[in-house]
Amino acid sequence: MDNVKAKTVIRQLISLLPIDVHQRLLFDHYTKKLTTMKAIMLFINAQLKQWSSYGEMEIALRAEPKLQQLLQLESISGSQLSRKLDQIPTELLEWMFQHLASQTQQRACHQGQSGKLHIIDSSSIRLPLQLGSWAKMSNKSSGVKMHLRLVVTAPDKLFPDAMIPSSLNVGDRAGAVELVVPSDAIYVMDRGYDDYARMDQWVQDNIQFVIRMRDRALATVIEEYPVPEGSNITRDAKVCVGSSFRSMEHSVRLVEFYDEQERTYRIFTSVWDKTAEEIAQIYKNRWLIELYFKWLKQHLRLKKLHSHKPQAIWNQLFLALITALLVEHIRHSTQTAKTNWQVLRILREYLYRSWRSFRIELDRKPSRSSPGRRPGSGPKVLSVRTMVGIIKPSKFKE
């Protein structure tokens, strides 16, 4: 990227997309100003900057000459943006997302870090009952789900490569149908994905999985394996899962262990070439997808939706994931030691500045380091430097 230092950061990001921002697509036949790709780029800007509404996007475009120059668009109304978000073909955004994910996967393979784990889970986003009646789950809840597959090549190197949006009443099992496909990776799932018929099919297709089972799941021991002394593993066995009413045809492996809080976990797996300790550690990595969902909702525009129409919501979900992959690409290409959140924070401030100034800030070393004041090293002093306000002495002593 350094061979085009004169470019702004936003132009660098645009160059990563598989379609030119000024290209008119088939869907733009009758469009005069806001073409599909211009709208997509504007919504990616909204994700990066966390613009909260169509009105804020409208003002931001009028206020930023470099964004106007980039999009060749001086202004656009919030109502036009609202209509456009619902008109963008979701299949186009899904293809762009998969293109970026494929590039990320190729970089990982070149480094010898192909996807070792594929973590499957879903996260819900609530909708107002009055506006989200099409996604009602009960008289008190309405919303949508993001069913996600997260590729983990290392604890600090992970990225999404597949996503299925759905209404809130779609179960996790249904969402996993298209997310679990033949692969060399190990699929990691929590309770809620324990479908015996599907697990049988995975075993038959040589798909490796590690699933936490519900406590009520029945397992008949076929063969017990020795458990290492002094470890947190309490059982390692070959079992037959289910009862006479409903059961699996193929046998699987049962690994039981407890964590630091003495909580017990029952894991069913089709992986036989790893130790019980390794199986337990693989399942513990499932927490990474929880952290990833939290990162998306905190740092991108995902927790609060711009629209309450199905296609517009699906589009916003894919736009958030596309933005996350762009941030990951910048972090990888610059070879910075900073986290994705640190890179995103700098991107926000330097989005319309030169790439060179962004790199200077990204590579900047702390001016000085200090261990800080040690706890309890000095007396506690209540500092009040104003006559405004009332403080009543507390009766309670520390």
Residue ranges and their predicted role:
Residues 1-56, 60, 73, 85-88, ...:
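Single, function-defining residue in the core of a domain
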Residues 107-111:
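Short boundary motifs at domain starts and secondary-structure transition points
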